[in-house]
Amino acid sequence: MSRIGKQPVAIPSGVEVKLEGNLLKFKKGNLAKELDTKANVNVEIKEGQILFSPKGEDRQSRAYWGTYRALTQNIIIGLTDGFSKTLEINGVGYKAALKGKVLELALGFSHPINYAIPEGIEITVDKNNIIVKGSDKQVVGQVAAQIREFRPPEPYKGKGVKYSTERIIRKAGKTSKK
């Protein structure tokens, strides 16, 4: 029994939800999202809540039940509040700057790295912090992971790009024989 799937998803004021066949359509202002359940779960909209139930009693149906409920919750949170991830840049000479829709990173390579910002994502740079914001949780996480991938933090000095919540396990360097 899915503990997540059986919880109803509340529809906040200002968010419109429509069910057209297997397609859930969400709208708030000029932002619109869609979720196709592909007929894997039963969906009902009652009294300002979205209710999910499994199609069958098999393991796969129960797995989809919780998954689609979580995806729906993330879409609603994304439309109302949005998601953000903060990255920190540590290292001498490591910098980030915004130039239009391109994030320019100087991460100790012989050349700057230019990262084209995807549609629907807003990036702000504040000294050594890069803040990635957007309404789609998956895209925000993917963009943050791609930026981190350019120079992941190394364990000896901690130089590189890391999430603000990430803790780097440090290693001791070589000890010299005397």
UniProtKB/Swiss-Prot annotation:
Assembly behavior: Part of the 50S ribosomal subunit.
Protein role: This protein binds to the 23S rRNA, and is important in its secondary structure. It is located near the subunit interface in the base of the L7/L12 stalk, and near the tRNA binding site of the peptidyltransferase center.
Stated family: Belongs to the universal ribosomal protein uL6 family.
Protein source organism: Campylobacter lari (strain RM2100 / D67 / ATCC BAA-1060)
GO biological process: one example: cytoplasmic translation
PROSITE patterns reported in the protein's UniProt record: RIBOSOMAL_L6_1 (PS00525)
Keyword Cell inner membrane: no
Keywords: Ribonucleoprotein, Ribosomal protein, RNA-binding, rRNA-binding
GO CC aspect terms: cytosolic large ribosomal subunit
Gene that this polypeptide is encoded by: rplF
InterPro entries assigned to the protein according to its UniProt record, in alphabetical order: Ribosomal_uL6-like, Ribosomal_uL6-like_a/b-dom_sf, Ribosomal_uL6_a/b-dom, Ribosomal_uL6_bac-type, Ribosomal_uL6_CS
Record-given protein name: Large ribosomal subunit protein uL6
Keyword presence, rRNA-binding: yes
MF-aspect GO terms: rRNA binding; structural constituent of ribosome
